[in-house]
Amino acid sequence: MKITFWSDFACPWCWIGETNLEAALKSLGRTAELEMKAYELAPNAPRMGGETTFPRLLARGLSWEEAEGRIKEVDEAGAAAGLPFAYGDAIQSNTFDAHRVRKFVEAHFGRDAAEKLSERFFRAYFSDHVELGNPEVLCRLAGETGIPSGQVRAFLDAPLDTGTEARIIADAVREDEMTARSTGVTSVPFFIINGKYSVPGALDQAGWEDGLKQVFEEEDRERQRGPFGAGVTCGPDGCSIDFDRE
């Protein structure tokens, strides 16, 4: 099974949805290839000096009570997934460089290292309340997950000239976002299972388990049947078709 999903480190439901997905796979005793694609909820957000969640919700027109309710809903969903959320104090910051660093890490250290870094980025944003647009923060967080911070620093400092690795990876982030638009993705998280089943939004663990069971059962049936369909067979009671010979 392959699950492709668009995600942003500034999206609380992305962290919750991905965590519940991984928990569901573990509960089912199954594995899947997980491919993350970059998405920016606020591409024009400042690298540093952004506002926390509460005033941003008020600026969107929510009342005081509605903003409190929105924050409480996220915190409770996070707690149910075992995540230490404090959504109200999260500081909005630009995530473009965080996406670039993740792709750099995946290219040089593998997908497991990139997934570990993603988890650290989410935790930093929603629990530690640091600014992911700050290159010093990105280097430190990478170092905490075992990635040489000096390599990350050199990558972030490199000019985005045509043909350079820094430019190629930056273009890959933009390509992910263009693919999202062409696919019809307008919000995250957004999951596509085996290239045909779309899951827009975060599910709880039970919701993931119910859906994944059906897809895995379908995979098992197809694996047993193969691509050839049913042919002519014979059994104890005879053959399904008799071929007359003259």
Kindly label every feature range from the protein language model.
Residues 2, 12-96, 103-105, 110-112, ...:
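Chalcogenol-based redox active-site neighborhoods
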Residues 3-6, 18-30, 36, 103, ...:
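C-terminal cap of thioredoxin/glutaredoxin-like
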Residues 9:
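Active-site beta-to-alpha loop of glycosyltransferases that engages the nucleotide-sugar donor
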Residues 44-46, 97-98, 161-162, 199:
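Short Asp/Glu-rich motifs
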Residues 96-97, 239:
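A C-terminal junction/extension of Radical SAM enzymes
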